UniProtKB/Swiss-Prot annotation:
One of its GO terms (biological process) is base-excision repair. PANTHER family: DNA-3-METHYLADENINE GLYCOSYLASE. NCBIfam families: 3mg, PRK00802.1-3. Belongs to the DNA glycosylase MPG family. GO terms for molecular function: alkylbase DNA N-glycosylase activity; DNA binding. Keywords: DNA damage, DNA repair, Hydrolase. Its EC number is 3.2.2.-. This is Putative 3-methyladenine DNA glycosylase.
Length: 197
């Protein structure tokens, strides 16, 4: 059952928004499909996610809290931003303690010109088709780590739940542990998926 709710872009319904995220990551990862994510006026529709849990060997939270992953153990509904391979900034939404959802792809809807300038391409389907591309297109920095959605220009706008038949599911990408877990989710037919299912 979906726990989606209409939430304010800034402030207002912070408690309700946090409750939407205070669940296990696989459930939140599915519910986030079709929602709109915005960071400082730039964003789009979420079309691909991956779930990570504290008992998951592929998760940053698997060995417990560290200075790097502290946000994963913080309040639900916050951003966990980390540097991947020393190059790409990746955006996750924190759920229950130690749970997070990696945002893998967006269909850009807001701030396309700014995204294109940051990414060096104006091909819409390539602007946010992958976690590293999202980080670049949204202008993320490590200072964004721990930011609560609903503050500092970060927002998730929930829409109507996506029909089960429109949701794709498969193994996660780019990991060597627990690679068979079917915790990658996507919207069927989206041209902006990072990779085919």
């Amino acid at each position: 059952m979906s726990h989606r709710r209409q939430t304010a872009q800034e402030g207002g319904q912070m408690e309700g928004q946090a409750a939407c995220f205070a669940r296990e990551a696989p459930a939140v990862a599915v519910d986030l499909l079709g929602a709109h994510l915005q960071v400082r006026g730039v964003g789009g529709r979420i079309v691909e996610t991956e779930a990570y849990t504290p008992d998951d060997p592929a998760s940053h939270s698997f060995r417990g809290p560290t200075p790097r992953n502290a946000a994963m153990f913080g309040p639900p509904g916050c951003a966990y931003v980390y540097l991947s391979y020393g190059i790409h900034l990746c955006l996750n939404v924190v759920c229950a303690p130690g749970h997070a959802v990696l945002i893998r792809a967006l269909e850009p809807t807001e701030g396309l010109a700014q995204m294109a300038a940051r990414r060096g391409t104006d091909v819409a389907r390539l602007l946010c088709s992958g976690p590293g591309r999202i980080g670049q297109a949204l202008g993320l920095t490590l200072a964004d780590d721990g930011t609560a959605f609903g503050t500092r220009g970060f927002a998730v706008r929930w829409g109507a739940p996506v029909a089960a038949g429109e949701i794709l599911c498969g193994p996660r990408i780019g990991i060597s542990r627990a690679a068979d877990m079917p915790w990658r989710f996507g919207l069927r037919g989206s041209p902006c998926l990072s990779r085919r299912f």
